[in-house]
Every structure is written in structure tokens, then in C-alpha cells.
Amino acid sequence: MKKFLFSLFLILFVQSSFGEILEVYTWKPFPGRSEQLLQTFQEAAAIHSKLGIGVTINALGVGTSQNMDYVLRYDDLESYGRLKDANFYDEEWNTFLAKARANPSGELVSSWSANNIDPLNMADDFTEEGQVIAFFRWQPAPGAVGLQTMIQGASESKPIHESLGARIETYQINSGENRGQVL
């Protein structure tokens, strides 16, 4: 039992410390302003990309009111800190942010962050133009055993989906809405 708990702790520590980091911001466009929100996202993405931050824009089509996700990706904790600082002090970003805040086209409805279970995955793996991305959130049973069982199940199903041509990544939400869920 001690070996199992130590292994579980080690797995959770490694994934939280070294894996790719996502920040997901879900926005709801104001009525009639979906196009403007998308244009705002594209302008923000151009600035973030210049700074070296991976960006994905997802229109949520099921169960939402035209909500959109703006996703920032970082390779690891070091690049997260370095790029967040660069973004904070970037003149182009701050000018853009002031303009977007003066005439918003939507409202932020949620935000959260997650770590990739695979510490070797890099943020730029998701920056290919035209990629189709889908997220599925799973709530593990309470406790460390529930989380480990969920991660094991995701790992076991991965080869099945990949044999059908899909690319599968598993993340654990570590802050914000639905903390502890697995993607």
C-alpha cells in the first residue's frame, strides 16, 4: 500500500510540476457581437503568438450560447512564468487590452487551468492550423484512488482512439472551475 501511495504521489507531483500548462478562458459574446469577439481573439492570438505563447480558439457548439474558449498553452512551469511576465510588460498587449476593455464584445464566464498528464507534451503540438480539438470533462470519484482510476482508464482507452486516427491527451484541471476534473 505504501508503494502504491508513493507512486500515486510521485505521478501527481510530476504532472503538476512539469507538464504542459493550459489556461482556458470561456467567453460569452454579447448579442450580435460573435464576429467581433472572434476578431478580438484573433488580434490577441497574434500578439500572444509573437511572444511565444501557444494559442487555440475554440467555438463551443454543444450546450452553449455561442460561447468561445481562448486557450493559452505553455510547455512547463518555467515557460509559464517567463511568458506571463513578458506578456504583462508587453506594450502591444497592454495597448490592445485597453482597447478591448473600452469596447468589450463579450463577457468572461469562466476560467481554469490544467496540466497535461504527459510531461513530454509541448505547447506547440497544438498550434497547427486547421486542427479540430474537442475536450471532454470527466469528474473522477472522490479521493486519490478515484483520480488514479480515471487517469488509468484514460491511458487504457488512448490506444483504441489513436488506432482510429485521433490524437488523445489527458489533462487534470488544477485551478478554477471544476478543479480535479480530468480532460
Language-model-detected regions and their locations in the chain:
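Short S/T/G/P-rich N-terminal loop/turn motif that feeds into the first structured element of a domain
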Residues: 18-183
